[in-house]
Design a protein with these regions (language model features):
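A broadly used, surface-exposed interaction patch
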Residues: 53-117
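Long, charge-rich C-terminal accessory regions
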Residues: 133-172
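Non-catalytic accessory regions used for complex assembly or targeting
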Residues: 1, 27-29, 90-97, 104-107, ...
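Flexible, charged surface loops at secondary-structure boundaries
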Residues: 20-32, 55-57, 88-93, 113-118, ...
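Short acidic, S/G/P-rich loop/turn micro-motifs used as interaction or catalytic elements
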Residues: 10-11, 41-46, 68-74, 101-107, ...
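A short acidic, amphipathic alpha-helical/loop segment
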Residues: 18-19, 47-54, 108-112, 133-137
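Conserved, mostly hydrophobic/aromatic
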Residues: 37
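N-terminal basic/disordered segments at the start of proteins
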Residues: 1-30, 42-45
Length: 172
């Protein structure tokens, strides 16, 4: 499984839209999706909406980071939830992605309100200070994630057990 992270700028979104229209994210033999791109929204634009709608139309999945790094995003979480909630058929094709930061619980609660469970989500635990936050989340909300993206260091593989979900090493 390959989970590339994009910053959600206009040209990246346009490229993703073209690639999904050509079915480049599916494996040729069985139609299984081997690549799930993850977008960290910078702005809430019509290009982002069109990109998500293209994935839905092609029945392909796309990950959206619901708590983007504040220095990247020029909007607040309320705007993102309103924006995403307005798109039809999001649950089958839009995978929520969460950075394991101090606000994860508020973000996850809002995701729960719109019908997502922990098993639907991908956790991003890329920095060592995020490991205890991920462990706390697992303790408060038992069950595994769809995937857990982890940093390259051995600290991640040692501290994050398999029960949390399939680990995917994130290389920058």
């Amino acid at each position: 499984m390959y989970l590339p992270i994009f910053r959600g700028r206009q040209y990246e979104l346009l490229a993703l839209e073209e690639e999904v229209q050509q079915n480049l994210f599916c494996d040729i033999s069985g139609g299984n999706q081997r690549i799930i791109p993850i977008v960290e929204p910078v702005n809430l634009t019509t290009r982002l909406t069109k990109t998500i709608e293209s994935f839905i139309k092609q029945k392909s999945q796309i990950g959206i980071i619901f708590n983007p790094k504040s220095e990247l995003a020029s909007f607040d979480q309320d705007e993102l939830f309103t924006f995403i909630s307005a798109i039809e058929n999001i649950h089958d094709y839009v995978i929520p992605v969460l950075y394991m930061t101090s606000d994860y619980d508020k973000t996850f609660l809002r995701l729960s309100d719109i019908g997502y469970s922990k098993a639907d989500c991908i956790a991003l635990c890329l920095e060592q200070p995020q490991i205890p936050i991920l462990q706390e989340f697992y303790g408060n909300e038992p069950g595994s994630f769809r995937f857990v993206l982890v940093g390259e260091s051995r600290e991640f593989t040692r501290a994050i057990p398999r029960e949390f979900g399939p680990k995917v090493i994130c290389v920058d």
